Design a protein with these regions (language model features):
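Conserved aromatic-histidine-acidic binding/catalytic patches
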Residues: 26, 41-49, 68, 92-95, ...
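Charged alpha-helical initiation segments
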Residues: 2-48
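A structural signal for well-ordered alpha-helices, especially hydrophobic packing surfaces
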Residues: 35, 39, 61, 108-111
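Long, charged low-complexity segments
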Residues: 81, 85-197
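Short, contiguous, well-structured surface segments enriched in hydrophobic/aromatic residues
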Residues: 44-89
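Glycine-rich, aromatic-bearing surface loops/beta-hairpins
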Residues: 196-209
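Hydrophobic packing residues in well-ordered alpha-helices of helical domains and bundles
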Residues: 31, 50, 97-100
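Short, hydrophobic/aromatic alpha-helical segments in well-folded domains
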Residues: 34-37, 53, 103
Length: 209
């Protein structure tokens, strides 16, 4: 335990803050929790959580893969181009690293899947589309990615959300398993929840994994 006394407004006890008994969780353990979160989200049909977590997972893999690249968009697209797209069982030029990056920005910043909400899209986007529509296709429908011309300057991109999340999960899982030391040594500070308990009536212990 790492002692760190502090005061909480309305509470006179002493706080001891540190890491959970048994030591810190390593990067692999925390990434495994993200894998599990995506699986559970898909199983419970919480598709918003499944997609946002999948897009965040790409961010994490990209930082491990290209730690010296300071521009997040460049390392994000590099991991997609070098790793993800090369292993997709279905592909389409419109499901590009550029469009996935702008989908990520729209989802995380505005809760939208429309890449055109980003003012940089018209200038920097490649294989531009009118909209990106994550879709739940029938199980018997074999196509996973559709591009529809709706009479506008750019087409609309539809992709199978479950397929995309499952592929990101599978490819990222295989990639981390094949790069264990790289993952362990990466300078990540991944999310984890702190928990608390009373040690005595006047002492609160807060610890995180």
């Amino acid at each position: 335990m790492l002692p760190c006394s502090s005061k909480i407004k309305g509470y006179k006890g002493v706080i001891t803050y540190g890491h959970k008994r048994g030591g810190k969780m390593n990067n692999l353990s925390r990434i495994s929790e993200i894998f599990q979160s995506i699986r559970l989200s898909l199983e419970s049909e919480n598709y918003f959580a499944a997609l946002t977590n999948s897009l965040i997972l790409i961010d994490i893999c990209a930082k491990i893969y290209a730690p010296t690249e300071k521009e997040p968009n460049k390392r994000y697209k590099k991991w997609i181009d070098d790793i993800l797209i090369t292993k997709l069982t279905y592909s389409n030029n419109y499901l590009s690293s550029s469009n996935i990056w702008f989908l990520r920005c729209a989802m995380l910043h505005e809760g939208s899947s429309d890449p055109t909400t980003n003012i940089s899209y018209q200038k920097f986007g490649k294989m531009k589309v009118r909209d990106i529509v994550p879709t739940i296709f029938p199980k018997e429908f074999h196509d996973k990615i559709l591009v529809a011309d709706q009479g506008d300057n750019y087409p609309t991109l539809f992709f199978d959300l479950v397929y995309f999340c499952e592929m990101v999960l599978s490819i990222a899982s295989d990639w981390t398993n094949n790069n264990v030391e790289l993952v362990k040594e990466s300078a990540l500070n991944l999310f984890s929840v702190a928990h608390s308990e009373f040690a005595t009536s006047n002492n609160l212990i807060i610890f995180r994994a």
